[in-house]
A protein has these predicted regions:
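Proteins enriched for Cys/Gly/acidic motifs involved in redox and nucleic-acid/cofactor modification
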Residues: 1-203, 243, 254, 258, ...
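Conserved beta-strand core positions
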Residues: 4, 41-42, 146, 193, ...
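Generic beta-strand/beta-sheet core signal
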Residues: 7, 196-198, 233-235, 261-263, ...
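Conserved SAM/AdoMet-binding glycine-rich loop
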Residues: 76-80, 85, 90, 187-312, ...
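Conserved, mostly hydrophobic/aromatic
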Residues: 158, 178, 195, 232, ...
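Short beta-alpha junctions and helix-cap segments that line functional grooves
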Residues: 244-245, 317, 411-412
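Extended hydrophobic-aromatic, low-complexity segments
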Residues: 256-257, 270-271, 282, 294-297, ...
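Terminal RNA-binding accessory module
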Residues: 336, 344-443
Length: 443
């Protein structure tokens, strides 16, 4: 049996794919290495979504190739979106790579590894539209929180996005399969479950009944013992209906936090980018959400420099950001992706787009500072994530913060805390976008 190392790049959905491959490898009797040095095969599960992700993936491949040249690792197998996107080009441009699997071939990870170990190259690209095969996972997040992917692929076909070409059409997992996995995760210590897909709001709409099943799924997840927080990401504005709002508002386990990617607010740009809905829909939705779900934290993503964005359209976006005061915003520079309709459209100057993204970040920074200042004096429930040796402090997150992408709460405590503890923290300060406070018994 062999020792297999894994590197997972990109989003949480990619991480789940990697965890499933790890499970298959272990089930076949191989050992999953904690690092990569000493591995007989290194699997690099890549992201190829935008230019920066492609560059990161290539850097990791080259770094691993350097270790291979030194004899510190054996074979290199590249999987994920970069391999799906560039296929044979990877082997041609990087001969150090021994094999590639597309996004439709994750289930073939074990035979691919065994083929590599027998001295053969591997190239396998299965159908990206095939139903996902259910399997276990080797969870790589801290024990107390886990991601659960409820669907694969995307059928939205936004003009700027390459994902449907890499991941195939939208395919929901069966509800019972999702619930079974969630129960296993909870039994193994998961307290915060983070629901992800390319578009969680369309869960179930590809089944014969064409019914939105996210509300039903969330209600069933709330019945699982051990789960304390359930967080929902990637909900599209045109699919948020009253039933979903009612479930989020009424279920105590569902944190009052929604990740709603809007990308822009200008009607002309939304139409050109093949986004359903318009500015009026978004504004009315946000107003309804704020009214129906008190304390709701809205996260979104915005893209600066989309084709057709002149100064007038950009200023409209800035004003929208100031008026809507979304608590969490990721601002990105438009990246023209070959093979997408937007790549052939007239582009905004790259430097102008970069400056616009920085402007959005500055506006949002002020909004976040004001939001954080408003938390001072409040006692908030915080999930402890760990201890920072350098800061000599525990840290965690409130319901307003998703792992890795949002802020932290620095916790002063006279008693030792443990990862996965829920504690009440009275906020007494703000530090570089994070909150700070002390443990209190106050509810």
């Amino acid at each position: 049996m062999a020792t297999i190392g894994f590197i997972s790049l990109g989003c949480a959905k990619n991480q789940v794919d990697c965890e499933r491959m790890m499970f298959r490898v272990q089930e076949a009797g191989h050992t999953v290495n904690e690092g990569i040095v000493g591995s007989d095969v290194v699997v690099i599960n890549t992201c190829g979504f935008i230019d920066s992700a492609k560059s990161e993936a290539i850097d990791y491949i080259l770094q691993t190739a350097a270790l291979k040249a030194e004899g510190q690792v054996g074979k290199i197998l590249v999987t994920g979106c970069l391999s799906q996107r560039y296929q044979g080009d990877i082997l041609q441009e990087m001969p150090e790579v021994d094999g590639i699997l597309g996004t439709g071939s994750y289930t073939k990870i074990v035979p691919a590894i065994e083929q590599l170990l027998s001295g053969h190259k591997v190239v396998d690209f299965g159908s990206i539209d095939a139903p996902e095969e259910e399997t276990g996972r080797v969870v790589t997040t801290p024990e107390h929180f886990s991601y659960i992917k409820i669907a694969e692929g995307c059928s939205n076909r936004c003009a700027f996005c390459i994902i449907p070409y890499l991941r195939g059409k939208y395919r929901s997992r069966q509800l019972d399969d999702v619930l079974y996995e969630a129960r296993v995760l909870a039994a193994n210590g998961t307290k915060e479950l983070i629901v992800v897909a390319q578009d969680t709001s369309r869960y179930g709409t590809d089944f014969p009944e064409h019914k939105r099943l996210l509300p039903e799924l969330l209600r069933e997840l709330c019945k699982i013992d051990g789960l304390h927080w359930i967080r929902v990401h990637y909900v599209y504005p045109d699919e948020i209906d009253d039933e979903l709002i009612d479930v989020i508002a009424s279920e105590p386990k569902i944190v009052k936090y929604l990740d709603i990617p809007i990308q822009h607010c200008n009607d002309k740009i939304l139409s050109t980018m093949h986004r359903r809905g318009d500015k009026k829909l978004i504004e009315e939705l946000f107003a309804k959400l704020r009214t129906r779900i008190p304390g709701l934290v809205i996260r979104t993503s915005l893209i600066a420099g989309l084709p057709g964005e002149g100064e007038e359209e950009f200023q409209e976006l800035c004003q929208f950001l100031r008026e809507q005061r979304m608590e969490r915003v990721g601002a990105f520079v438009f990246s023209p992706e070959e093979g997408t309709p937007a790549a052939t459209m007239e582009h905004v100057d790259e430097e102008v787009a970069r400056e616009r993204a920085q402007t959005l970040e500055m506006i949002q920074s002020q909004i976040m500072d004001e939001y954080n200042a408003a938390q001072i004096g409040k006692t908030l429930e915080v999930l402890v994530d760990g201890y920072d040796e350098e800061q000599e402090q525990f840290y965690g997150r409130t319901y307003a913060d998703s792992p890795d992408i949002d802020g932290r709460v620095w916790i002063a405590s006279e008693e030792p805390l443990h990862e996965g503890d829920f504690v009440n923290v009275t906020i007494d300060g703000c530090i570089d976008g994070d909150l700070a406070g002390y443990v209190t018994e106050e509810e």
